[in-house]
Amino acid sequence: MKNKGLLSASLALMMALPMQAQKFEDNFENKTLRLDYIVAGDSVNQAIYFEQAYSNPTWAGRKTRLDEKFLNGNGQVTVYEHGTNKVLYVNTFSTLFQEWQLTQEAKHLQKSFESSFLVPFPKKPVDVSITLSDTHQKVTAELRHTINPQDIL
């Protein structure tokens, strides 16, 4: 009898989980938002600067499990519902700048590198966070800013 109750509770929980998953169409259009940044610094210091945003005609990325991080990289792009910390989309990456930071040149020279990230095109304003981390996953630089899709051509 105890097993039947446990089985029933497990089935109810499994049926409820898919209902909580976000739908792509609720927050995003079937388009791509390309975000361009400049990442600059040397072997010790780094900074992130927003350059511009572009709209591309279709979204070719995943449309399910948008708020799940599948791999750890040296960086992360996260799209939040504007004004809240609700994650709408997350993806990880590693930049050429972070590889360059490990070179001898980076010990005595500052450089900047362009980086572009593709995210689903939001229907409403969103907050975007770009985070860079070291090899121990300690955050070394972060930029968070608002993107209004009506301002993008």
Model-derived regions, located:
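N-terminal prosegments of processed precursors
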Residues: 22-115
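Serine/threonine-rich low-complexity intrinsically disordered regions
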Residues: 3-5, 103, 148
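Bacterial Sec-dependent N-terminal signal peptides
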Residues: 1-25
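Residue-level signal for secondary-structure boundary sites
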Residues: 17, 85, 136-138
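Extended acidic/polar, glycine-enriched regions
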Residues: 109-153
